[in-house]
Amino acid sequence: MRLLRGTVVLLDLSPTRGHGQRGVRPCIVVSDPEVVADQRYSLLCIVPMTGTPGQGALYPALGPGPSGLTKMSYALIDHLRSVDKRRVQRVFGLLAPNELRAVDDGLALFLGFGDRLAPEPTPHVQ
């Protein structure tokens, strides 16, 4: 199964421990299919979604539409995880480009990537 970045899938995330999202819920595939195809294990990197609004860049809003979502949903960037592809129960559709950008911005913030978190080093002057 080859899933593009931004694909919305229905996954069974149980079992989990602690505060991890559990149960059957929509999730966004954020791993690159070209990289995943060459890996030893059949894993996807995903971001779970919820219907409960969150504040800030780690919880971008995702509207109903071509993604297959039927109501306003919110990505839970801080619940990023890898799952086996066998957990996929259904494929819905793709996020709109602006929604995937918002997810990518949240991932960059959460993982410490990007210009706003990693300024260019100042050249050393002797």
Language-model segments: which ranges?
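Conserved functional hotspots at enzyme active or ligand-binding sites that engage polyanionic ligands
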Residues: 1-126
